[in-house]
Amino acid sequence: MPKILIVTGDGGEAYEALYAVHRFQEEGWEPVVAAPSSRRLHLVMHDFQPGWDTYIERRGYGLEADIAFDQVRVEDYEAVLLLGGRAPEYLRNNDPLLETLRAFDRAGKWIFAICHGLQLLASAGVIRGKTVTCYEHVRKDVETVGATYVVKDAVRDGRFVSAPTWVQHPAFYREIFRCLSGA
């Protein structure tokens, strides 16, 4: 059974995390949730409300992290998925995680990112020259490191696939599974 590494942490987007785990299980993949340490994570739910300039946040569900970043062996996985929410705000300072992302890139493996997950790719320095999409308030993060931001439901550039938010899950996961099937 192929394995995918799913990266999140406390403050990660609950809907993105639970959907990812279940979606990969449905397709016969083994999802492995990675975080700074293997323990129960505290996820949050984000929503978009009329009249607000940004999203609102509520307490979400919990999710068990299967493995700590410093225990990840890139060769055990076919791909990595970086989730959004607030977790990337602090995870982008985690050196073992950033080195793991660079190793996925060097190995030519698939790298998928949604929402604020693009902050991790920006910090790892692996999206220079790439065309990506992300949550609109992450735009400057990706442009500052030399990526091109576009407004689309899902963007594939080489081995990278990105999407803005959980609202774009249908397009994002269609593209992910198209890539993983070799299409």
Predicted regions and their residues:
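Extended, subdomain-level signal for the structured scaffold at the beginning of enzyme domains
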Residues: 1-107, 111, 120-131, 139-183
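Catalytic nucleophile serine of serine hydrolases
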Residues: 115
